[in-house]
Amino acid sequence: MPHPEHNTSVFLLSLGCSKNTVDSERLQAQAEASGITFTQQAEEAEVILINTCGFIEDAKEESIMEILAAVDMKNAGTVRQVYVMGCLTELYRNELQEELPEVDRFFGTRELPAVLDALGARYHQELYDHRSLLTPPHSSYLKIAEGCSRACSFCSIPKIRGRYLSQPMEQLLREARLLQENGVKELNLIAQDITVYGVDLYGKQMLNDLLMRLSDMEFRWIRLLYAYPVGFPLEVIDTIGNRSNICNYLDLPLQHCSDPILRSMNRGITKEQSLRLIEEIRNRNPDIRLRTTMIAGYPGETRKEFEEMLEFAGSVRFDRLGCFPYRHEEHSPAYSLIDTVPEEEKQERVSELMELQEEIARKKNEAFVGSLMTVLVDRPEEGEEGLILIGRTEFDAPEVDNECLLESGSPEPSPGTFVQARITGSTAYELHGTVESLME
């Protein structure tokens, strides 16, 4: 192991998505190898490092607010330096440097060695697959690709992150093995688009091959997130059904169902093709749970087209669904369109779709009452009637999906423990139950 070179203390604030989290984890592992220490409180650090998000306006505003708070601490003498990295810098480096001269350095999304150098550390090539987890130690992400080569009109990710670049399979397997050795039990595969994994490196889709190799390891749960619907390799659905440690779960963001909107979004798929894909997935694996996301209020979306989305969601009955109002982002291709739907109307459409989904989710969850389910305990929490355990089933991804609230038993299962739980009640987004037994 490399010897310590510096003992600077750093407070690392990682904002945005799970892909950003992985970047921050890699940075922290590299810095720690050079003797850098990381603190849990900004007040205890010499340096504040903020890994920003620049995807939508709300995320940009959060990033700016955190930068300003860090600058205030620097001006007050609480910290010595402030560094800013990530997606916001990638989009607005010149403007940020001009408006925030108090920030010592700005770094983009592909400048890890330069960030380390600024911290007084160096990049260790032999540690390229090491990470210091910022997630609970039993659950982690495996980022299988960088960037995106799709051209969805509402999205600025290709501009921020560059073209799609698959990570070599052997490298991913080594990284996964390290995560497993460090106690990770749930592995969540992520990328901007997992569907085309391998095409740029191997000339063909390799998601199924990677999934089977990972399944041969000793992870209890492996989960697939961010599957692009066009060209999704259906053999993956068969593998999910055949392998007990791959969750019966697929995150398949569709974004809309109306053909004119899908064309404008440049999604490369029609409503009918979406329906056929969903039908094929469910036919191949009736146990699978599907998650999707939708955008309401896209430029040109009429009330009729929104009602088409309502009807679509009502007939497909997704197991998990998130809906977001369209954001008119200046670095996305859709910025050239007129933002026709008023903000208030966008929010009303989001609420209307989510009310429909809430009723669907409530009925789906009611079907679990009385059953015995495997639950991964994430954390204890103080409830109104004492300590409860917060966990998830295989049908629920971290942070975005449902939770299972369990009465604390004796002995109390620790975070990262799998339990058999009897489901005694439900709401739209929660299951309630009791622990019947701990699992090996």
Curated annotation (Swiss-Prot):
Residues 8-124 form the MTTase N-terminal domain. CDD domains: Radical_SAM (cd01335). GO terms for molecular function: 4 iron, 4 sulfur cluster binding; aspartic acid methylthiotransferase activity; metal ion binding; protein methylthiotransferase activity. Residues 366-437 form the TRAM domain. Its cofactor is [4Fe-4S] cluster. One of its GO terms (biological process) is tRNA modification. Keywords: 4Fe-4S, Cytoplasm, Iron, Iron-sulfur, Metal-binding, S-adenosyl-L-methionine, Transferase. Catalyzes the methylthiolation of an aspartic acid residue of ribosomal protein uS12. This is Ribosomal protein uS12 methylthiotransferase RimO. It comes from Chlorobium luteolum (strain DSM 273 / BCRC 81028 / 2530) (Pelodictyon luteolum).
